[in-house]
Amino acid sequence: VTLAVLAAAALPGAAGAATSAPSDSTPVTLSASPLGVDIAPWDPVYSTTANFNAVQPLLKAAGFNEIHYSGGVTADQYDWQTDTDLSNCPAGQTFADFSAACVTSDALDFSLLSQHARDLGAQTFATVNYGTGTPDLAAAWVAQAAATPGQQVSDWEIGNESYGCWMEDEWLADPPANIADYVPNGPCPTTAVMANSYAVHAGDYMTAMKAADPNAQIGVPWAFDNGVGGAAVANNTTWNDTILQADGADISFVDAHWYPFSFGGNTDPAGKKNPSDQQVIQSVMQIPSEYAKIRGTLNTYDPGAQVIIGETGVSFLETGVPCLPAGALFAAGDVLSWLAAGAQSVNWWPLDTNTNLDYTGTSNCQQDEAMFTNPRNPATASPRPLTPYVGYLLASALAKPGAQLSELSQQGDVLRFQSVLPGGKVAVALINTNTGSAKTATAGSSLSPYLTVQTYSAGNQNSTNTKIATTATTAAAIASGITLPAESIVVLTQRTPKPSGMSLTATSATVKAGTKVTLTGNLTLNGAAAPAGVSVKVNRQVGGRTQATLTVKTAAGGGFTVTDIPPATGSYTYAASYVSNTYLPATANHAVTVTAAKPALKLAASAKSVKPGTKVTVTASLGAPHVNKTLVIYAQVKGGAKKVIKRATVNAKGQLSVVFTVKANTTFTVTFAGDTWYTAGSAAAAVKA
């Protein structure tokens, strides 16, 4: 990373900033190492056993698969053979005096770095020393890496930000051989002079490195223009065109260091006000156009060359952003935007610094650039993630090696990314860059029914601003859109729900009308009994149509019981179901046949024998069911026809009475026509006269 203050440019992310394309981008197949981090030889975390043991699992959890080694300006002062650098040299030292006067030993040598990288499952991307090194020193490194198991390097870069005056070793009394027109304490050479010098000397490096390993992948620094806040120069096209035209045949990639801002502390170098959090987050909207510029130049000189983002961050200076939720949103948008545009990998600068030595949370978080804190005493405290780590962690759900990543069309302030992962599952990231308002966005149409939702929101945070809330939903539930809190990231990933099971039985498969049907069932979730209080629905169905829905909750052990009285005779199906966002649906059916019951119909006369002309009371008793039921009472005098003497609805007791004058032997009959529960019936009584 740069150590000098550059001329300030307009703040990206403000009004008029470039935005992403209005349509979905073409899916890009991600490399084997899309997610990277910069680690320098002086790194105090990765070189300390206790710190390493704390950080490595977190790097694995976030899917880091590249380490960019040798570290910013240190790269051009670092001797990999002695594991020393010259960063503490006072001004005015001669080149010959370096090793004797001011050598500094580093803790993280190449062997240990390689061991840690292989444990992480990461590739190594190394920058060789172009400042105080030589082609032979670089070639020896390449040879050892190729010949030593576990020390392989996937990509080699010649020099760090060699287009910038801050890399000219201006404190020297005499220059290294590869720096042209050097004047001690004098002005920086022009971009053209620097580019021509680099093209010649970098060619010498390439020749030596290729001789050591013909398969070595070698890259060079890419210079942004001054419209980019950090690691940028005027006349950048002179640098890029000169190098690519001269050495393009041997260049496998360019290394672009992207810092959209150049502020640190309370103001940027020009004294301007710091950008707002929203401006910081929305600065990533420039990335598609910046990548297009790089690719356009490469297509002219070296179409096969790849683009590596060897360093990135909000600014090349320490800021408060890594303490804030904006740091997570920026980091996620940064890495996903570059990868979706076509970058081979994106490396955050740096893993850690010496800034947050006593960190306990946001209350004492110091301005920083890093992903992790560096505890003053590893024996009593462990490195803690800062918010850029959270951004990479969330982005890793999409940025899998071999995935097909695309940036979907932007919806207002919402950035949208979709990744088809190896195996076919789909993941989506939605970033609401608006820090003041919630926004609604759609997630595309490729998601499976069951989804895991990870939400990182500035408005719902813990004391370290690293809280990610995890819930579950379905594609159907968010088909019309998902509401994103202000300043938030929502990541949707497909999931395979846990299994569930259900049984359902009844006391009998056949019951008489008017009788309760008692059903018992059991619900299991992921092979174990469901806890008490889980809701189960039981539908009473006829011919596939639901007549009624009963809701019941499980008891301890997963059992449940429900009772019902079917409204009529016939065949019924009771369908029990359980639906959730966590488990697969569970269903169970049970068939019940309801048959008609015989009514308890009786008929009685007030007397069995009377004198002719005597009035008798004839009473019919229906019994259950008797509410609103109609009976018909007949009288048939001996030798005469059967006649209706009363047709009426029974009273509340289920009875119907009639007074009849008996003149001769008479037979009384009562009939019930039947209904949906009961069969037709009749009863008779005789009176002699």
Language model: regions and residue ranges:
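Enriched for extracellular/lumenal, surface-exposed ectodomains of secreted and cell-surface proteins
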Residues: 566-588, 662-682
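C-terminal beta-strand-rich structural cap/linker in extracellular carbohydrate-active enzymes
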Residues: 471-498, 666
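Carbohydrate-binding surface patches
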Residues: 410-448, 453-456, 490
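N-terminal catalytic cores of secreted or lumenal carbohydrate-active enzymes
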Residues: 18-249
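Aromatic/acidic polysaccharide-binding cleft in carbohydrate-active enzymes
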Residues: 309, 313-399, 403-416
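Noncatalytic carbohydrate-binding groove/subsite architecture in carbohydrate-active enzymes
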Residues: 193-334, 341
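Short strand-edge motifs at loop-to-beta-strand transitions and within beta-strands
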Residues: 480, 558-562, 654-658
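Proline-enriched interdomain boundary motifs that mark the N-terminal boundary
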Residues: 499-507, 598-605
